[in-house]
Structures are given as structure tokens and as C-alpha cells.
């Protein structure tokens, strides 16, 4: 019965409309305003379906990241360790990491003092230097090298990768440059630079960065090739959008997750390279504390049961920083993927 009433009403309205159209505009002018305009009813479901989305990329990224409790816990711990490493020299009661402590009565050096004895929190080494001060100083040195290497590789690698993948005329040049650099082991270049130049923080940063960016560039290039000719990029080029704007607005946001992951992996890799180059005797001098120097010194006494703490503590710091950066980088990469933002 209800459907029949609706059909009859619809037919009646159609008949009236046909009559008005046949009579012309004069018939419409005679109608009162109430019959010409009818307010549309409000529907919450319809409004919700057509409303503006309040989506925020970075807001969704951080919400997804903070759901990973392990990554958040590691991030808090890593921030605490890094902050303490750089603030430690300014705390009260700290000593020079290169100071060789001696007994004020006998004048004998405090050699190989066990942790917790005579004011040495993590013990002392063979010449009486405080391992607590040296390990945190070494962490500062290694982290500084790693941060600068990651920053240089990211800036140079992203720039070269975008040009390599987006500008077709540069493809041959970057491909040949990649083939040349890729066929020379980065370890050999690092050893040569450390051997020719005097070992220093700047030398290590240069040696690690001089070829490290090429891997980032190739990775970015491959990602750019995937999205370069998608419809929205083709449309942007057709309407004359500047290349720089296309790169910044269309390409780089798509690559945030993979860039963050690569940078997070570069930091522990740089620390590992510093440890290796110091281990073979071409790294920083012993006057410059670094995790590589400390681990190398601890390796020499690791067979002596009472002195293994000299290898244990710097290894713990190195392992924690390496694992934390790796897991946090993976977690942030997953969180930055828009596919994981769906509720």
C-alpha cells in the first residue's frame, strides 16, 4: 500500500512538471516560492559519508608507531642513552677520559681496578684511566661520526637518486658512476683514506660517506622509477607543475618510510665501520676515545678473567645502540607506510 501511494505521488508530480514545461516560463513565475524551493532534509549518515576527511599523514604515522610498545620503549631508552652520552661531561663529579688516576699516597697508577672499587664505576684500564668516562666519551665520538655519515649519505643519496630516477637524461651518467663505485669495495676506500690522511673524526666521516651515498641513491632511484609515470605525476607535468614541486609534493612523501629505514640502518653500520677500521689499526688514535678503540683495548685482555669487564661494557653500549636503531627504524618504516594507517 505504501509503495502504491509513493508511485501515485510521483506520477502526480511528473504530470504537474510536464504541464508547467508545456506552458513555458510564465507558468513557473506564477508559482509561489514555497513550491519552487523545498529544503533538503538533513541525514547524519549522508553527511558522514560525504564529509571532509580529517586524515593527517604524520598524525597517523605517529599513532601507528606508538602502538608498537617495544619500539616506543627502545626509543625512550635510546634517547636516554644518547642524551646522557652528550651530557655526561657536564655532570658533577666527572673526570677527563684521558686522565691517568694515581693513588694520592703511593703515587702508583690505579691500574685495572675492578668495577665499583675506589670510585671507578666501571673500573679502570691498564694505565689507570676511568672506563666510565672513556666509554661515554667513546659513545659520543662514535655517535657523532654515525650521525654525520647518515646525514651526508641521506642528503647526497636522496638528491642523486631523485635526479637519477626522474631525469632520464642523467640515467646513463649515474649508472656508469654507480658501476665504478660499486666495483670498488668501500672497505678498501676507507682503508686507503685512513692510511693516506691522518686518522681523525673528519677523515672517517669522509671515508664512510664518499661511497656510502651510492647505495642510497640507487635505492631511491628504483623507488622513483616505480612512481614516476603514475597518473598524478603525468597530470602534474601536463599542467606545467615545476619539477621541484613534483619531487617535493608527489615523490618524496611516498619515500619517507624507506628513507627513514635506510637512515636508521646507516647509523649502526657507520659505528660498525668505525669499530672495524680501529680494530685493524687504521682508526682514531688512542688519545681519542671511541667504541672502536675501547673494544680493541678490551679484546687484548679478554682472556684474563678479571679484566673482561674492559670488553664487556663498551660491547653492551655498542650492541644496544645497534639493535635499538635497527628495530626503531623498522618500526617507524612500517608506521610511515600509508597502507598501515587504515583503521
Can you describe what each PLM-predicted range is?
Residues 160-164, 193, 220, 233, ...:
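Hydrophobic alpha-helical interface/terminus motif in multipass membrane transporters
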Residues 178, 218-257, 333-342:
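Intracellular coupling helices
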Residues 75-77, 145-149, 177, 190, ...:
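Hydrophobic core positions of alpha-helical segments in small-molecule transporters
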Residues 1-154, 158, 162, 169, ...:
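Gly/Trp-centered helix-boundary motif
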Residues 129-144, 148, 168-171, 175, ...:
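Amphipathic cytosolic juxtamembrane alpha-helices at the membrane-cytosol interface
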Residues 191-192, 196, 200-205, 209-212, ...:
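Non-cytoplasmic
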Residues 121, 152-157, 162-230, 260:
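Generic hydrophobic transmembrane alpha-helix motif, especially the helices
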Residues 150, 209-212, 222-223, 262-267, ...:
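Residue-level hotspots within the lipid-embedded alpha helices of multi-pass solute transporters
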